[in-house]
């Protein structure tokens, strides 16, 4: 983990590997190491630049409500600072929304975009869910994580975690980032519908069939609305990035190779 001072803000990021650069955005409550398992399973070397949202990792805590476009501008400025003119972009959950918006705003710089459990517009059920997350985290991050694991993994995935479940809960709860409430407030406001028609980079949309938070129909909508998009459905819940990292790496590797 390292950081960069930009416009009086500290921007945290991780830098791993060598090769063509990939700008990777994490999901709500997370930090830039969210893509570690996918990176480790990747079929070929890449340079992974993990961007920390405000309030995550080494990034400064937000002083106002988060603005998606400002996050995108900061991330692209970071890539320029690191010497990258063009790059692949990938994102998970809120990070997928950010990656898609990045591809729409900077079509000349984004080589490909990968959306993992992304969506265009937060619907009523999602807004209620995100509000519940805010309340649970405020009460007890461990209570939130017990709910998240129960709802975010498949039964098969929870079977695999069973021998170490309490340890996983404790570790995961300790990783809930200080800026999570701001992330969730942004989640509730998401609407990038108008951006979908502006994305010209090859786009891989990965949806999780058992996702209870971002319904698989959200992935279907992205894939049908974005020119040059392909769809992959994986048999997992929203926490697919932990449960099926190898499958994500394989699909994304094929996408980047093409």
What are these regions (language model features)?
Residues 91-95, 99:
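Gly/Ala-rich beta-loop-alpha elbow adjacent to hydrolase catalytic centers
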Residues 199, 205-207, 211:
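Short beta-strand/loop motif that positions the catalytic acidic residue
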Residues 236-249:
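Catalytic histidine-centered segment of alpha/beta-hydrolase-like enzymes
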Residues 9-61:
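Conserved HGGG/HGGXW glycine-rich cap/lid loop of the alpha/beta-hydrolase fold
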Residues 40, 49-90:
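Active-site loop/oxyanion-hole signature of alpha/beta-hydrolase fold enzymes
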Residues 100, 104-105, 110-140:
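Flexible "cap/lid" loop of the alpha/beta hydrolase fold
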Residues 212-218:
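Conserved alpha/beta-hydrolase "acid-adjacent" motif
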Residues 124-126, 142-195:
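Conserved alpha/beta-hydrolase catalytic His-Asp/Glu region
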């Amino acid at each position: 983990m390292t950081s960069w001072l930009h416009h009086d803000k500290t921007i945290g990021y991780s830098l791993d590997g060598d090769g063509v650069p990939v700008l990777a955005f994490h999901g709500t409550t997370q930090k830039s190491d969210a893509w570690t398992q996918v990176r480790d399973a990747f079929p070929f070397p890449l340079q992974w630049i993990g961007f920390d949202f405000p309030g995550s990792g080494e990034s400064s805590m937000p002083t106002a409500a988060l603005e998606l476009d400002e996050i995108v501008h900061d991330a692209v400025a970071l890539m320029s600072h690191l010497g990258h003119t063009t790059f692949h972009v990938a994102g998970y959950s809120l990070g997928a929304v950010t990656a898609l918006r990045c591809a729409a705003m900077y079509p000349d710089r984004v080589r490909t975009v990968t959306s993992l459990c992304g969506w265009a517009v937060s619907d009523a059920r999602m807004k209620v869910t995100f509000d519940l997350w805010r309340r649970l985290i405020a009460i007890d991050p461990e209570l939130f994580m017990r709910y998240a694991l129960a709802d975010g993994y498949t039964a098969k995935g929870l079977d695999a975690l069973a021998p170490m479940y309490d340890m996983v809960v404790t570790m995961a709860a300790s990783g809930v980032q200080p800026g999570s409430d701001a992330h969730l407030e942004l989640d509730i406001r998401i609407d990038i519908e108008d951006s979908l028609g502006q994305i010209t980079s090859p786009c891989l949309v990965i949806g999780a069939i058992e996702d209870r938070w971002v319904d698989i129909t959200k992935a279907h909508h992205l894939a049908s609305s974005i020119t040059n998009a392909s769809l992959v459905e994986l048999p997992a819940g929203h926490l697919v990035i932990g449960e099926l990292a190898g499958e994500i790496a394989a699909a994304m590797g094929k996408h980047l190779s093409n």
